[in-house]
Amino acid sequence: MQVLQYAPLDLVTHLRDKPSTVDKPIMRPWMSDVFDVAYVPDPAIRRDRLVSPAWQANADGLTGIAPALVVTCEFDRLRAEGIRYAEALRTAGALVEHQDVPATDHGYNILGFGTRALTERTYRLIADHVRTAMTG
């Protein structure tokens, strides 16, 4: 079972090229330089479909991949790539659920930008899907 909560799924495209719909998004372009290098130091490897499954055609042909829950945030710069990956998973028959958390940005659950109830609801959703995957 894949659980992807506001995951970086395209490390090829720099964060400055990923739009946000809010004036002051949590994810700033400089963060791409820090996190992308920390995750995968070699830029050439970032093109690998296992590293950037939402980049270009990397999400094509996902048949047989593990089932997935994808959680995106409405204002997150990573939202579009999460949606692209969720759509590819749906095409492959592997999307269990895509939850787009409304009126939230990246890190809402740990930075205090979402309500406690919203965070708890998302965590319950994740726990329920993992429990179902483990117990059938």
Question: Language-model segments: what does each one mean?
Answer:
Residues M1-G136:
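Alpha/beta-hydrolase superfamily serine-hydrolase fold, recognizing
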